[in-house]
């Protein structure tokens, strides 16, 4: 999304966090932030771009991923290969549904989008973290 300020990447929950972290650290291109949630690995590229790596979990009738404050639920999806900027990535086959579930009207630019308040598919997993986030929004 043009107005998004970071890159979000999803990996399945079976992905070994230790192996993933080691590969990222050994590349020399990223700083790994301290983990505040077992569901998300936050890194920053040397060029300053923030990247959130979300672990996706499969339940019997939904897929979900989470951060330190919220959990987002999605309709189960298949992955397809998709070419972007000369590379091939796996994306949800029905990417419109996935993006709509996570962002609402994702085609409309929203400069002050806030994943804690503007995502239609969220549920709160840590009220303390959410309150801290809300207080920061009031101050900044």
Please state what every model-predicted region is:
Residues 24-90, 97, 112-139:
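Conserved catalytic core of two-metal-ion nucleotidyltransferases
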Residues 95-96, 103:
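C-terminal catalytic-base region of ester-bond hydrolases, centering on the histidine
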Residues 1-19, 86:
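Catalytic metal-binding acidic patch
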Residues 19-20, 95:
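Generic structural signal for hydrophobic residues
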Residues 21-23, 101-103:
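Short active-site loop/helix that positions an aromatic residue
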Residues 103-107, 127-128:
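Acidic, metal-coordinating catalytic segment for phosphate/diphosphate chemistry
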Residues 7-11, 91, 99:
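Long, contiguous hydrophobic alpha-helical segments, chiefly transmembrane helices and signal peptides
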Residues 15, 93-94:
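Short coil/turn linker and secondary-structure boundary residues
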């Amino acid at each position: 999304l043009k107005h998004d300020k970071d890159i979000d990447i999803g990996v399945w929950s079976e992905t070994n966090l230790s192996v993933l972290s080691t590969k990222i650290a050994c590349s020399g291109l990223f700083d790994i932030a301290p983990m505040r949630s077992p569901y998300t690995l936050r890194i920053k590229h040397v060029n300053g771009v923030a990247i959130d790596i979300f672990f996706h979990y499969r339940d019997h009738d939904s897929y979900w991923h989470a951060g330190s404050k919220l959990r987002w639920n999605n309709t189960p999806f298949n992955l397809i290969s998709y070419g972007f900027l000369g590379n091939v990535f796996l994306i949800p086959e029905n990417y419109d549904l996935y993006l709509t579930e996570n962002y609402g009207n994702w085609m409309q630019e929203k400069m002050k989008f806030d994943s804690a308040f503007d995502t239609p598919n969220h549920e709160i997993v840590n009220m303390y973290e959410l309150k801290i986030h809300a207080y920061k929004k009031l101050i900044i």
